[in-house]
Amino acid sequence: MATIKDVAKMAGVSTTTVSHVINKTRHVADETKQTVLDAIKALNYSPSAVARSLKVNTTKSIGMVVTTSETPYFAEIIHAVEEQCYRQGYSLFLCNTQNDPDKLKNHLEMLAKKRVDGVLVMCSEYKDDSRDLLKSFSYLPIVIMDWGPVNPDTDLILDNSFEGGYLAGKHLVDNGHKKIGYLSAELTKVTAKQRYQGFIKALSEANVEMKSEWLFEGSFEPEDGYECMNRLLALEDRPTAVFCCNDIMALGAISAITEKGYRVPDDFSVIGYDNVHSSRFFAPPLTTIHQSKARLGERALRLLFERIAHKDAKRETIEIHPELVIRKSVKKIA
């Protein structure tokens, strides 16, 4: 593998001149510059990214730590972030934690050793030790992309799950539903709890009370939506509509409904959350709460770049508001 010394020898210049040509740190005569570039091409020389980063104090790389890259919601956000990084000339290191604090610690240590310019963190739940861990990496520019720990050492993007839950509940009561169930992820998770609280507020404003037996907890997976809906269908007194904590749970719920010979929305109305790309192709197309994954990725990355440029500036919290997307899975009743 060619070195900078090999390039300098072939071009008949010093290694310092080669460095200036590569890093554009000083004017070099056009003829000399072309000679160096020709030597680089002939030798197939690739500058050391680490060595270059030490000179210019940037690696043009970003770390992203997520719970998982497999679920549609996370996958779409990761795609949006990667697209924004590419346009800005940055590389993206993706790390999955599965909500394991040890993995979070190891990933952050690895990213710090790779001298990434900053880190985006998006995990579905933050335990106390995770909060303390993030504080110990306060020397890294970090942006939290969801309902994470609010502390003075990190910037934060909030998706306002409370407002989204409220929009879902209000849409159902506005369509005449008074018997409404909720298929939730574990209510110990902040996002699920916030969506539930917003949902209950909308029902309360309309003087609609949700029976406790119509609340089922699972996880953010289709299997849990399917299982919870089957338990709901087994009840004698059943709701006319259900709010699912995310679109993937709604997919499982719709599958359970159709397997029992019922139809959506004729027999049961279903509303989801997230507006993942595939939700428009559900049968029927899913009414859901939209969170712009592209906007979330863009805002988070922009905030991170601002933090990288101004490390001592006051930490910011930016709120992104969800929107209702009406399709064909909710029926208006008298």
From Swiss-Prot:
Hypoxanthine binds at residues 73, 189, 191, 220, 274. InterPro entries: HTH_LacI, LacI/GalR-like_sensor, Lambda_DNA-bd_dom_sf, Peripla_BP_I, Tscrpt_reg_HTH_PurR. One of its GO terms (molecular function) is transcription cis-regulatory region binding. The keyword Glycoprotein does not apply. One of its GO terms (biological process) is purine nucleotide biosynthetic process. Pathway: Purine metabolism; purine nucleotide biosynthesis [regulation]. Residues 2-56 form the HTH lacI-type domain. Keywords: DNA-binding, Purine biosynthesis, Repressor, Transcription, Transcription regulation. Signal peptide: none annotated. SUPFAM superfamilies: lambda repressor-like DNA-binding domains (SSF47413), Periplasmic binding protein-like I (SSF53822). Residues 4-23, 48-56 bind DNA. Is the main repressor of the genes involved in the de novo synthesis of purine nucleotides, regulating purB, purC, purEK, purF, purHD, purL, purMN and guaBA expression. PurR is allosterically activated to bind its cognate DNA by binding the purine corepressors, hypoxanthine or guanine, thereby effecting transcription repression. NCBIfam families: PRK10703.1 (NF007979). Homodimer. Consists of two structural and functional domains: an N-terminal DNA-binding domain, approximately the first 60 residues, and a larger C-terminal domain, approximately 280 residues, which imparts the function of corepressor binding and oligomerization. This is HTH-type transcriptional repressor PurR.
